[in-house]
From Swiss-Prot:
Gene3D superfamilies per the UniProt record, alphabetical: 1.10.1420.10, DNA repair protein MutS, domain I, MutS, connector domain, P-loop containing nucleotide triphosphate hydrolases
Family of this protein: Belongs to the DNA mismatch repair MutS family.
Domain of life: Eukaryota
The name this protein goes by in its record: MutS protein homolog 1
Compartments where located: Cytoplasm; Mitochondrion
Function text: Involved in mitochondrial DNA repair.
Binding site for ATP: 747-754
Single Gene Ontology MF annotation: mismatched DNA binding
Primary location class: cytoplasm
Keywords: ATP-binding, Cytoplasm, DNA damage, DNA repair, DNA-binding, Mitochondrion, Nucleotide-binding
Length: 941
C-alpha cells in the first residue's frame, strides 16, 4: 500500500528541493522473514495531518535568480557573472552578445525552462572587455563572489554574489587593453538650466542665435588611471573645440537631455560618436568632494569656480563612485583650466592642421603628433599630446621649456644617456594610482623601486647643471626616495615573483585546455571536476609557495618560515618511519577530497594488518583491490599545522605589503612631482633629438604681434617627402610686422598655398609648446587662438551643405578672432557662384583688416580680390606659380612664394595631371576664352 515520504533533490551546489511522494513499505522488510511467513504489507498511511500539498511552483536555481535580479538592477549593462573559472552570460544577453563575441551559446537545463548561456575563461576577461567596452560600446557589470558583510544575517553562506564594478570606456583603471600613450578621460557636460527652455537655435534673429552660442556650460573631466581632475567654464560655441582638445572616452549628460532628441545640442554630441551616459545632475558643496580627494581643494579654485563647474564636478564624482561600487576612487585636487593660460585651437583647426590624426583615414600616422613624437615613456607621450592640443600662452613657461630643449640639444651625449635611462622607467602616474586605489601588487612595488633607481642615476647626471635655472626646479622635484627603494628591495623577492609568473602562465594553459574541453563537450565539466577532487599531490609540492616577501624581512616571517621548515622535517621523519616499517608502498598524501591520509599499495591482506599493528590509531576509510587509504591522527595534525603555518605566512606577507604600500602612498605628493619631472625630461630630450635630426631652430617667443619665419617648413609634409627622397621647398612669412598683418595669396592648385598656410599655424603651435621649429629663424608673438578655414565637407547629419559649413566656420572666426589670433583661410566663397564668392571673400578680408587685426594668411583663386584690396594698407599680395617648358609643353610647380599676383590658376593643367580626357580639356580651353573676366589660358597644344 502506498504511503508518503520526503524526497530531497539536489538542484545546484547550494539548493535542495523537498517533496512528498508515494512509497510502499513492507513491514519487517529490514529483517529476514521467518520460514513460511510472508511479508506483511504496511497499511495505507497518508501524509502528516499538518501537511498541505503545495501547488507546483517551478522556479529558477538560486544562481539564475540572482543573475535575473542583477540584470534588472543594471539594465543598461551586459552582466558578466563569475562562476568558478568562467565569466558567464545568461538569458537574452547570452543570445544577443554571445555571437558578437564569437562565443558558443548553449542551453542550461533547469526545472523551469532551458536557459541560454555563454561564457569564457576568467583569464580572458580583458580580451572580451575590450570588445564589449571599446569596440561594441557596451557598459559591463562584473558580478563576483564576495565575503558577506558581518551585519548581513539573511543567510548562513559566507559568500554572496555582488556586482563589484561597472565598466565603461571612461571608468577604466588598469585594464591591459587601455592605450598607455593616451589619457582616458571621462567628461561631464552641464548646461545652463535655461538652455533647453528656448528654441532660438532653430529660429530667431542673429542676436538671438549669438545668445544661444554664448550659453554657459560647465565642464569637468578626470582620468581614473592617473587621478587627474579638471574643471572649466565654457559656452556652446567653444564646446566643439573643448571636446576635440579633451578627447573624452565617455561623456556624462543629464538624463533630462534624453527628452530633447530634436534639440541641436543632442545631434551635435551624437554626431561625434562619443560614448554617452546619462545621470541626474547633482549640485553639492565642494566639501563633499574632499572625501574623494588626496588633499583639500586649493582656495583659489573655490574663489573662481562657477556653479556650473561645481555641478559638473559633483555629478562626475557621484557617477564614478556609483560605477566603482565598492572601490574608493582616489582623485587629485581639481585644476581649473583658464582660457587665458593656453592657446585655443578650435575643432576645425584641430582637424585641418592634423594635430592628433590625419585628414586621410583619421589615423595617428600622418598627424603632427606622429611627426614630432620621439618620447620614450608612456606618460611623456600623454603629456606631449595634451600640450600639443593646448599650447601655453605663458611666455616665462614657454622659454623655460625652450631652455631645457636647448641645453639637451647642445649636450647630445647627456641627452642620449638620459633617454636610455628613461626608456627603462615605468609609468609612475598609473602605478601610484593603482596603489592609492588599493589595486596595486608586488609588481607595482618593484616597478616603483626601479623608478627610484633610475631617478637617482638621472639626478647624478644632471647635478653638474644645477646652477642652470632650467634644471634647478627639475632636480628639486627628482627626489630619489632611497629609503622607499631600500624598503621595497629588502621586502619583495623578485626571483620568487618571476617563478610565480611562470607558474601562473602554466596554470593558465591548463585552465585554457580544460575550458576548451568544456566548450567542446558539456559533459567534460563533470569529468574535470571529478578529476580535480580525486587528484593527489606530492606534499612538498602542495605546500610549496613562491613567497613574495623575503623570509628574513622581519622576525614574524623568520619564525614562521623556521616553523614551516621544522614541520617539513617532521613530515620527512614521519614519511621515513612509514617507509622503514612498510616500505615504499606507504606514502603520506593530501587531496581536496580525502584531506590528509596514508596511501598503501596492497600486495595482500598482510600489508593492511601490518599497518594496523604498527599504527593502532589509523582508521581505514577507503580500499580497493590494489590500494587502501587510512586516516592517521599524527599526519592529520601535522598537515593542519602545515596548512595553518602557510596561511599565517600569507597573512603576514599581506600585512607587510600593505604596510609598504601605505608608506609609499604617504609620499604621494613628492611622487607625483617626481613623475611630472620625468615627463618633463622625456619631452625635453625628445624635442632636442627632433631638433637635432630635423634641423629645427629655437624660436624667439615674446609678447609682440609678429610672425616672422625664415625658410619655414611643414613638418608633416617634409617627413612624407623625405621617404621619397624629395626635398621640401621652404618659404618665408612676415605677418604682424609693422603695418602688414594680412597676406593675400594667389596661385595655381597643387602649388603649395594650403601647405604654406598650415605650416605657419603649426610653427606657432610648436613654438608655444616649447619646441624648436622647422625654420632657419623664427620670431613668434604669443598667439591666443588659431583659426582655420581650410576644406569643408557636407554635414548631412545636420542637413548642412558644404557652403553652409564654410560660412558657419567663417562666421565663428570673424566673431571671435582677436589681434593676438592667427587666422588661415583658404578659398572663402568657393561653394557658391563666382560673383557671390568674390563678394563674400572681399567682405571677410575687409572685416579682418579693419576689425579683427589678426595675423592672417588668406589664399584664393579669385585674383580680382587683389585689385579690390589695393587700398588696404595692411594687406600684401604674394603668389605661387608653375614653370612651363615651351618645347615639350610640360610644367612643374616651384612651390616658392613670391611677392605679387598670379592671375592664372592653371586649373586645366591640374586637370591634365589628373588624367582628364584630352577632348574634355580642349573643349574646356575653347569655352574658357569666351567667358568674361578670365585670363587667356596657356595653350594645351
Amino acid at each position: 500500500m502506498p504511503t508518503w515520504r520526503y524526497i530531497f533533490s539536489l538542484r545546484s551546489k547550494s539548493s535542495f528541493t523537498k517533496t512528498w511522494v508515494p512509497f510502499t513499505q513492507i513491514r519487517n522488510s529490514s529483517k529476514s522473514p521467518k520460514v513460511g511467513q510472508k511479508p506483511i504489507l504496511q497499511g495505507a498511511l497518508g501524509p502528516p495531518l499538518d501537511f498541505i500539498r503545495p501547488k507546483e511552483k517551478v522556479t529558477l536555481p538560486p544562481l539564475l535568480k540572482e543573475v535575473s535580479f542583477q540584470q534588472k538592477k543594471f539594465a543598461d549593462c551586459v552582466l558578466l557573472t563569475k562562476v568558478g573559472n568562467f565569466y558567464e552570460m545568461y538569458f537574452e544577453q547570452a543570445e544577443k552578445i554571445g555571437p558578437l563575441l564569437n562565443l558558443r551559446v548553449s542551453k542550461k537545463k533547469t526545472s523551469k525552462s532551458d536557459v541560454s548561456m555563454a561564457g569564457f575563461p576568467f583569464f580572458k576577461l580583458d580580451r572580451y572587455l575590450k570588445i564589449l567596452v571599446e569596440d561594441l560600446k557596451k557598459c559591463v557589470a562584473l558580478s563576483e563572489e564576495v565575503i558577506r558583510p558581518v551585519d548581513d544575517l539573511s543567510s548562513k553562506n559566507m559568500y554572496i554574489r555582488s556586482v563589484t564594478r561597472v565598466i565603461t570606456p571612461g571608468t577604466l583603471i588598469d585594464e591591459n587593453f587601455m592605450n598607455p600613450y593616451e589619457s582616458n578621460y571621462i567628461l561631464t557636460v552641464v548646461f545652463d538650466p535655461n538652455f533647453f527652455s528656448s528654441d532660438i537655435s532653430n529660429q530667431g534673429t542673429a542676436e538671438d542665435k549669438d545668445c544661444f552660442a554664448d550659453c554657459k556650460i560647465g565642464l569637468s573631466w578626470l582620468d581614473l588611471s592617473t587621478g587627474e581632475f579638471f574643471t572649466q567654464d565654457s559656452n556652446l560655441q567653444r564646446l566643439a573645440g573643448d571636446l576635440t582638445r579633451i578627447s573624452p572616452r565617455e561623456i556624462v549628460l543629464d538624463e533630462s537631455l534624453k527628452s530633447f532628441t530634436t534639440h541641436p545640442i543632442y545631434s551635435f554630441i551624437q554626431e561625434r560618436k562619443y560614448f554617452l551616459s546619462y545621470v541626474e545632475n547633482r549640485y553639492q558643496s565642494l566639501d563633499c568632494w574632499n572625501k574623494f580627494l588626496e588633499k583639500e581643494i586649493d582656495p583659489s579654485f573655490i574663489k573662481y569656480c562657477t556653479k556650473l563647474e561645481v555641478t559638473a564636478g559633483c555629478t562626475l564624482i557621484s557617477y564614478i563612485a556609483d560605477r566603482l561600487q565598492n572601490s574608493h576612487p582616489n582623485i587629485q585636487p581639481p585644476i581649473r583650466v583658464s582660457l587665458n593660460e593656453y592657446m585655443i585651437i578650435g575643432e576645425s583647426a584641430m582637424k585641418g592642421l592634423e594635430i592628433r590624426s590625419s585628414l586621410y583615414q583619421n589615423r595617428y600616422t600622418g598627424s603632427l603628433l606622429h611627426a614630432i613624437n620621439k618620447t620614450v615613456t608612456k606618460s611623456g607621450s600623454r603629456l606631449l599630446t595634451r600640450r600639443l592640443c593646448a599650447p601655453s600662452t605663458n611666455i616665462v613657461e614657454i622659454n623655460n621649456r625652450l631652455d631645457l630643449v636647448e641645453k639637451f640639444k647642445l649636450l647630445p651625449e647627456l641627452c642620449s644617456k638620459v633617454i636610455n635611462l628613461l626608456k627603462k622607467s615605468n609609468d609612475t602616474h598609473r602605478i601610484l594610482q593603482h596603489l592609492l586605489m588599493g589595486r596595486g601588487n608586488s609588481y607595482d612595488l618593484l616597478k616603483m623601486a626601479d623608478n627610484f633607481s633610475i631617478t637617482k642615476e638621472i639626478h647624478s647626471l644632471l647635478s653638474p647643471l644645477e646652477s642652470s635655472s632650467a634644471f634647478r626646479l627639475l632636480l628639486l622635484n627628482m627626489h630619489p626616495h632611497d629609503e622607499l627603494k631600500q624598503l621595497i628591495n629588502n621586502a619583495v623577492d623578485e626571483n620568487a615573483l618571476m617563478k610565480q609568473k611562470i607558474n601562473e602562465e602554466e596554470e593558465t594553459e591548463v585552465i585554457a585546455q580544460e575550458a576548451e574541453e568544456i566548450l567542446q563537450d558539456e559533459n567534460a565539466q563533470v569529468e574535470i571536476v571529478k578529476k580535480s577532487l580525486s587528484s593527489e599531490f606530492d606534499i612538498r609540492q602542495s605546500f610549496k609557495e613562491n613567497w613574495v616577501v623575503k623570509s628574513n624581512f622581519n622576525n614574524n616571517l623568520r619564525k614562521l618560515h623556521e616553523k614551516l621548515q621544522s614541520l617539513f622535517a617532521s613530515y620527512d621523519k614521519l614519511q621515513e618511519d612509514l617507509s622503514k616499517r612498510l616500505g615504499k608502498k606507504a606514502t603520506l598524501r593530501k587531496s581536496p577530497a580525502k584531506l590528509y591520509y596514508v596511501h598503501l599499495k596492497l600486495s595482500g591482506n598482510e600489508t593492511i594488518e601490518r599497518f594496523i599493528k604498527k599504527f593502532t590509531q589509523a582508521v581505514l576509510f577507503q580500499s580497493t583491490k590494489s590500494t587502501a587509504s587510512f586516516q592517521l591522527p599524527g599526519w592529520t595534525s601535522l598537515g593542519m599545522d602545515l596548512e595553518n603555518t602557510k596561511l599565517h605566512i600569507h597573512q603576514e606577507e599581506q600585512r607587510v605589503l600593505k604596510s609598504i604600500t601605505d608608506e609609499i602612498v604617504s609620499h604621494h605628493k613628492t611622487l607625483r612631482s617626481l613623475a611630472n619631472a620625468l615627463d618633463e625630461l622625456d619631452i625635453s630630450t625628445s624635442l632636442a633629438t627632433l631638433a637635432q635630426e630635423q634641423d629645427f631652430v629655437r624660436p624667439v617667443v615674446d609678447d609682440s604681434h609678429a610672425h616672422t619665419v625664415i625658410q619655414g617648413r611643414h613638418p608633416i609634409v617634409e617627413k612624407g617627402l623625405s621617404h621619397k627622397l624629395i626635398p621640401f621647398t621652404p618659404n618665408d612669412c612676415f605677418v604682424g610686422n609693422g603695418n602688414v598683418n594680412i597676406w593675400l595669396i594667389t596661385g595655381p592648385n597643387m602649388a603649395g598655398k594650403s601647405t604654406f598656410l598650415r605650416q605657419n599655424a603649426i610653427i606657432s603651435i610648436l613654438a608655444q609648446i616649447g619646441s624648436f621649429v622647422p625654420a632657419s629663424n623664427a620670431r613668434i608673438g604669443i598667439v591666443d587662438q588659431i583659426f582655420s578655414r581650410i576644406g569643408s565637407a557636407d554635414n548631412l547629419y545636420q542637413q548642412k551643405s558644404t557652403f553652409m559649413v564654410e560660412m558657419m566656420e567663417t562666421s565663428f572666426i570673424l566673431k571671435n578672432a582677436t589681434r593676438r589670433s592667427f587666422v588661415i583661410m583658404d578659398e572663402i566663397g568657393r561653394g557658391t557662384t563666382a560673383s557671390d564668392g568674390i563678394a563674400i571673400a572681399y567682405g571677410c578680408l575687409k572685416y579682418l583688416s579693419t576689425i579683427n587685426h589678426s595675423r592672417t594668411l588668406f589664399a584664393t583663386h579669385a585674383h580680382q580680390l587683389t585689385n579690390l584690396t589695393k587700398s588696404f594698407k595692411n594687406v600684401e599680395c604674394y603668389c605661387t606659380n608653375l614653370s612651363i617648358d615651351r618645347d615639350d609643353h610640360t610644367f612643374s610647380f616651384d612651390y616658392k612664394l613670391k611677392k605679387g599676383v598670379n592671375y592664372q590658376s592653371h586649373g586645366l593643367k591640374v586637370a591634365e595631371m589628373a588624367g582628364i580626357p584630352k577632348n574634355v580639356l580642349l573643349a574646356a580651353e575653347e569655352v574658357l576664352t569666351l567667358l568674361p573676366n578670365t585670363s587667356k589660358p596657356t595653350s594645351m597644344k
